[in-house]
Amino acid sequence: MSEDTALVVGLGNPGPQYEKTRHNVGFMVAGVLSARMGGKFSAHKKSGAEIVQGRFEGRPTILAKPRSFMNLSGSAVAGLARFFSVDPGNIVVIHDELDLDFGTIRLKQGGGEGGHNGLRSISSALGTKDYLRTRVGIGRPPGRMDPASYVLKPFSSVERKELDLVCEESADAVELVLRVGLEAAQNRLH
């Protein structure tokens, strides 16, 4: 990626009742990145997000968590992109991914949203799907459980034992893509 400002967005739902749910893994990874940046999230009134402003290896970086529910997060992401003049190619969205086994991390640019309404909202608000994604696997729901219910449930006790490591590795993946770009990061991770 270039030296232009990077916008890194962790997706999740606001409120303590969602804090430990699968859908909030993007917020969890953003928390790890915030600690690494040495910053604390604060409200950015013009966008409807909480942000940390800092530098990653000298590059201006905005770390964000939209304060709206995930399905409406596009407004905050587009607002931040406009306010900080960030091109969609310099946006990295961290989100939960049903189609990957728990703990699997994949990087991707553009493409479909795979039924993820948070991504759909962002694509619509930005007017493009051409932004980077850090996909954090949460696995498929068991049996016939509705995926919409599954993503709003807490991680299992077995998953919770590995969750901190998954969030650390996901943060590593975000930092890698910021450092070396998508293709080189994919070659190292995949």
From Swiss-Prot:
Entry's InterPro entries?
Pept_tRNA_hydro (IPR001328), Pept_tRNA_hydro_CS (IPR018171), Pept_tRNA_hydro_sf (IPR036416)
Keywords of this entry: Cytoplasm, Hydrolase, RNA-binding, tRNA-binding
Give the residue range of the signal peptide.
Answer: none
**Documented EC number(s):** 3.1.1.29
| Record site: Discriminates between blocked and unblocked aminoacyl-tRNA | 13
Presence of keyword Transferase: no
In terms of superkingdom, the source organism counts as Bacteria
Cellular location(s): Cytoplasm
Q: Which reaction does it catalyse?
A: an N-acyl-L-alpha-aminoacyl-tRNA + H2O = an N-acyl-L-amino acid + a tRNA + H(+)
Q: What class of enzyme is it?
A: hydrolase
Q: What are the site positions for Stabilizes the basic form of H active site to accept a proton?
A: 96
- Cellular component annotations (GO), alphabetically ordered: cytoplasm
Q: What does this protein do?
A: Hydrolyzes ribosome-free peptidyl-tRNAs (with 1 or more amino acids incorporated), which drop off the ribosome during protein synthesis, or as a result of ribosome stalling.
What the record says about family reads: Belongs to the PTH family.
Name of the protein in its database record: Peptidyl-tRNA hydrolase
Q: Which gene encodes it?
A: pth
